[in-house]
């Protein structure tokens, strides 16, 4: 009995000979690439990575991220209030920063402005 690798190599060699008889120039280079992929490298099981049926995959366990303490609704409400307060403060600060440049030109002149103004 021949192994699967030898059978695959024989099939590819037969296809190469058949295409050479037909005069295909491009096809042999493609089959050489395929034979490289199908031939399998060292340490691989025969048959390559082609599997039939379902593949078992490990399901990640995220239980370590879930806190196991009892959450009180009052605490959640306090967290929401604190978060909303922080957002309002951030909005206020950004508004002040944006208006600072605008308000610099809108300030009224001081009373003694004309005493020190060099422009007549």
Curated annotation (Swiss-Prot):
This is Protein BEX4. Zn(2+) binds at residue 117. Keywords: Cytoplasm, Cytoskeleton, Metal-binding, Nucleus, Ubl conjugation, Zinc. GO terms for cellular component: cytoplasm; cytosol; microtubule; nucleoplasm; nucleus; spindle pole. Residues 31-90 are annotated as: Interaction with SIRT2. Residues 31-120 are annotated as: Interaction with alpha-tubulin. Pfam families: BEX. InterPro entries: BEX, TF_A-like/BEX. Residues 8-27 have a biased composition (Low complexity). Disulfide bonds: none annotated. It is found in: Cytoplasm, Cytoskeleton, Spindle pole; Nucleus; Cytoplasm. GO terms for biological process: chromosome segregation; negative regulation of protein ubiquitination; negative regulation of tubulin deacetylation; regulation of cell migration; regulation of cell population proliferation. Signal peptide: none annotated. It comes from Homo sapiens (Human). Residues 1-54 are annotated as: Disordered. Very high expression in heart, skeletal muscle, liver, and kidney. The levels of expression are uniform throughout the brain. May play a role in microtubule deacetylation by negatively regulating the SIRT2 deacetylase activity toward alpha-tubulin and thereby participate in the control of cell cycle progression and genomic stability. In absence of reductive stress, acts as a pseudosubstrate for the CRL2(FEM1B) complex: associates with FEM1B via zinc, thereby preventing association between FEM1B and its substrates. Its main location: cytoplasm. Belongs to the BEX family. Ubiquitinated and degraded by the proteasome. The keyword Nucleus applies. GO terms for molecular function: alpha-tubulin binding; histone deacetylase binding; metal ion binding; molecular function inhibitor activity. Interacts with alpha-tubulin. Interacts with SIRT2.
């Amino acid at each position: 009995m021949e192994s699967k690798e030898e059978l695959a190599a024989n099939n590819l060699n037969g296809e190469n000979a058949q295409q050479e008889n037909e005069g295909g120039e491009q096809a042999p280079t493609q089959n050489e690439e395929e034979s490289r992929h199908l031939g399998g490298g060292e340490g691989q099981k025969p048959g390559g990575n082609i599997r039939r049926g379902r593949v078992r995959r490990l399901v990640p366990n995220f239980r370590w991220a879930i806190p196991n303490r009892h959450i009180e609704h009052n605490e959640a409400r306090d967290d929401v209030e604190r978060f909303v307060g922080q957002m309002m403060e951030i909005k206020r600060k950004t508004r002040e920063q944006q208006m600072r440049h605008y308000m610099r030109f809108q300030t009224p002149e001081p009373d003694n402005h004309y005493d020190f103004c060099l422009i007549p």
